[in-house]
Amino acid sequence: MEIREALTFDDVLLVPAKSSVLPSTADTRTQVTRSIALNIPLLSSAMDTVTESSMAICMAQAGGMGVVHRNLTVEEQAREVRRVKRFESGIVYNPITLTPDQTLADAKALQDRYNVTGFPVVDEAGRVVGIVTNRDMRFADRDDTPVRVMMTSERLAILQEPADREEAKSLMKARRIEKLLVTDGQGKLTGLLTLKDTEQAVLNPTACKDELGRLRVAAASTVGDAGFERAQALVDAGVDMIVIDTAHGHSEGVAHAVERAKALSNEVQVVAGNVATAEAVRALIGAGADAIKVGIGPGSICTTRMVAGVGVPQLTAIMDCAQAAGDVPVIADGGIKFSGDFAKAIAAGASCAMVGSMLAGTDESPGETILYQGRSFKAYRGMGSLGAMARGSADRYFQKDAASDKLVPEGIEGQVPYKGAAGNVLHQLVGGLRAAMGYTGCATVEEMRRDCKFVRITGAGLKESHVHDVQITRESPNYRIG
């Protein structure tokens, strides 16, 4: 038997090259799938201590994308997707509406379900007759109060199609209002514009958005009928990308799940994983996958390689899979500890990277905040940990029918230092990538994937690469040991 050598991020360094590229001018745009572009090559992990709607919103505003985890009921996960799609919507087409005969109770129920603060009021023909805002509802005493009593029906701020953003902003400023109704020539409601959305568009010019100006969001699903039903609900909620998320993507079940998910919609992209070999990549592309997620056991909280003895060191896995994928994007999932690892993953052939531990300690992550020995931490666990598997992710590790005391975990539960806003972490990650692009003379992500060269280093070389012979007295925001 021939035993092949394989490398990971700490085994190599990028070789500097002649460069006219300034880090500030480097182009970090990339394709996460064949049809969806990102402005920064980053995804947040589909983990229950990393990504729900708050993280997904932050990721999309920064130019990346969040993948909402699936340790939620189908309806809960779909609700998280809807929250992202409605957070910064440009023009909200087909907004949630009320009729004059509905009640305050109906409005509250819709408010809770869709996380919105106001509703256009329309008649049976779809013509605008009023608007109800959160302020109007606060002054109503009874749940059976009709909408017609609460709504504002006079001097409505209405803009006819085609709606111009600058005209809309001027009208809202002149009328001192936060919502603007958009109608067609017959007075029928076609959309809704909010002041918040117009302001967010200015604050986040590189946000990752769909054709309608809504933030993009992905969500995880699984195999079998349960996965198909979940995928259907996610499509109905407006998800942009479905991730068939399993520990071992090279299986007939995953390939079949890709085929079924692709049949749901021509608009939604399907990512499949996780894999670590060229053969697996070819199988999933043959099933119709729009991108491949690479990584068997490299994550900081993953114990698959110790429990099962299976995996491929991440750098080699990325290189093998990217070569086999051709023009189908590859996502490097796991093992990234520093921004330099992120740059190495891109140089190895990944179109983008997925990070978990680096974002788990941020404000936007759903993990519990813990105070320990005078410092703040946030809970972080692998989806193969006992706690996560008991909550619903056991099928990711093909243990769906196992009793809770018979589960064989492939991950641990722990904590990571509190890091503040996720935006700061993303800034440092992308800043490190830009620095690498400057050092290697690569103006674009595609050039970096194609032109970079590696040099293999020894243990002494790794020691030399880290801070040495000094005691750190003030921590850096992008470098931490232990």
Where are these regions (language model features)?
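Terminal amphipathic helices with adjacent charged low-complexity linkers/tails
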Residues: 70-84, 121, 125-141, 172, ...
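Glycine-rich phosphate-binding active-site loops on the catalytic face of alpha/beta enzymes
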Residues: 61-76, 239-251, 290-308, 336-370
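Catalytic cores of alpha/beta
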Residues: 54-58, 229-237, 270, 276-294, ...
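Bateman/CBS regulatory modules and CBS-like beta-alpha motifs in cytosolic regions of diverse proteins
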Residues: 24-39, 45-47, 76-116, 121-123, ...
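Alpha/beta catalytic cores of nucleotide-metabolism and tRNA/nucleoside-modifying enzymes
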Residues: 1-20, 98, 160, 170, ...
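Active-site-adjacent beta->alpha loops and helix N-cap segments on the catalytic face
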Residues: 24, 73-82, 140-144, 188-208, ...
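Hydrophobic faces of well-ordered beta-strands that scaffold small-molecule active sites
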Residues: 42-45, 64-68, 94-96, 157, ...
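Short, ordered loop/turn segments at secondary-structure junctions
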Residues: 70-73, 124-126, 133-137, 185-187, ...
